[in-house]
Amino acid sequence: MSVRANPPVPSQRRRGAASEPGAAPRGSRNWPLLIDICLAVAVGLAVLLVHDVPYMLRHSFWVDEAWVADTVRAPIGLTHSLGLITPVAWTFLLRLVPFGGPERLRLVPLAFTMLAAAAGYLLGRELHLDRYITGILTGAAVLLSPALLERDDLKQYTAEAFASVVLMILVARLENEWKIRRLVAIAAVSSIGLLFTNTAIFVGVAAMASLGLECLVNRRYRRILDLAAASAGMLVVSLAIYVTLIRPETSSKLTAYWDPFYVPTGSGARAFHFIYRQLAGLAPYAGFRPFLVDALGVLAGIAALIWLRRVALAAMLPITLAIVIVASAAREYPFGDLRTSTFWLVLVPVLMAIAVSAAGHAAGRIDRRAPLLVGAAALAIWVPATNVYVRSHTIPNEDVHSQVTYLDSHFRRGDVVLVSYAASYAFAYYYPATPSFPVGDGPNGHVVAYPKLPYMVVLPQRQPSNLIDGLAEARRKIAAEPPGSRGRIWIIRSHQTPTEIKTWDRLLAGQPVQVIRVGPDPVLLYLYRPR
């Protein structure tokens, strides 16, 4: 049995109208759905125009991507631990990419970007305003979201954005018509979604809380029991996934890395200042550069949803933000980092698009052309405003791939290869020989090693003592070779700290070293000859 959650907004047709006398034939009733599907697919495919796909498929992985990419070269049993807190199911998807060059793994986040854009269109469809116009506006909001346009890297953040939009769709559908299976769908996406994202539960809890608020506002008290049961199931499944898969991979090193993004708890004034500063810093990636414009756009969207009697949708983003802030204060999730904020930043332009569509719908009572004109005017502002992010190249320029290619084509018998700590993860992905990943002091609890290759020296850390010991070991390997067959020492480096650079300069000062420029970090060829 189903019950309507809200009275229809003025533009909605009464359910079952198609069965009344004079209704259109069944075949013609399918055309709007077919058009919706085609438009959703078109918006999704438009992602290929606003992202530089050739750049994504040829730009070398940098260190933060490389240790995720290494999961496809490791035994399948190491996939979860190597990926650290990267969602395990998302990480397994990397093994399924069937075509492309070495950087083909970025097709996974690209696919989720396309799904998010298509879902953006479908969200507009569920609002029951001006069907195609609203969908195009909300689809364009996701498609040209600066936060998503910046995300070409090998991370799960686009999947998190997709999950957020999907949860908004599910809440809208539940507002359209209350059905238990729709409520269960929200609980399932929010909990099982943790296998693909780290943030679905934040938005899911916000969705359930928002629906509870709507039930109170509309005095639908009996539905609160359904919400409580679905929420309990959602939290139980989420807790099980968190305890077994996520929490064990959270380390003190990771917590320390995100320390600047945790809300201070010692003073209310400091906390408020921190939150404002972080939000202001993210404003350019929310929609428009001035923070005030973004804030007014969000408030307009919330007001429009309240006018449409969609209290749950109106409350979702504010409650999501509140949850993230609380999680940050508890040192469980960073607040204010662009990458980890993508999942909620993408909702900001969506709310703006809803405000525009609602305004056009209201104006349509005066002039039927108003929704189209208002929508066109909004796109005329939105497209140029986000153009600076279109086809942007924001992946850090660390080209271990070129270094490995040069090394592989010039390596000779007797040579020794010395790989720096930070370069080792990309090296492990690109170098043809199969690496091993023993437990160590790496960002994911593993380091790179080549126990079957005696000519390989991989530094386990980046302290000066590690560089000194590694270079000494490489020299010993050269000295141990017969005088007539001694090779050279290849030094592969990337993502260096200032201390590393100074240490290398000191260690190699006055030594016979050739600098071979094949990328941002040149290959060093050390012609060491023992005395």
Language-model regions, residue ranges each:
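Short, Lys/Arg-rich, polar N-terminal cytosolic tail immediately upstream
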Residues: 2-32
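Membrane-proximal helix-loop-helix interfaces that form the catalytic/acceptor-binding platform
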Residues: 3, 28, 32-531
